[in-house]
Amino acid sequence: RVLFRSTDDVDDYGLPPHSIEAVVYGGLDSDIAQIIYKELGAGIQTTGQKVVEVITASGATKAIHFNRPHPVPVYVKVVGLSTSGDFPHDGVDQLRAAIVAYIGDNESGGVSIGETLYHQRLPAVLYKVPGVLDFDVLIGTDAENLQADNIPVDSRSKVVTDDGMVTIDA
């Protein structure tokens, strides 16, 4: 996700005039900095907490700034799972893997930076596992306060989960 400011004043997010802020999920810092440098227009500054030095075409070094998204942990609980005979022996593991793949973990994939996690989209993910008939799914950023509700995030954040944050009560 790239936030940019083309005017002469600071915006509501604190972006300085004539600057970009790349919020990047995944990848190596050095690769990210090289890509930003290659695509950066003249006179545009970069902002962010990560700073990587790149070598310019003239042999000079230039500091490239960018940010990683703020991780928003998501806990998921599937309750009342009802299945048919088509449900595979490793179906619970498949459900857990499907949830992690859809939301994304700390390394890759899932819902985009700045995108709300919509509760109503999760059932479609779970019904892809053969033999799933019915269930309820609850989500939240606190394991003790799960709800059937959306999880909004700001433009510099990303929802993440992992196997240990997904509970399936069959």
Regions found by a protein language model. Name each.
Residues 67, 87-170:
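An aromatic-glycine-centered, glycine-rich loop/turn in mixed alpha/beta architecture
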Residues 1-115, 169-170:
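Carbohydrate-recognition loop of C-type lectin domains
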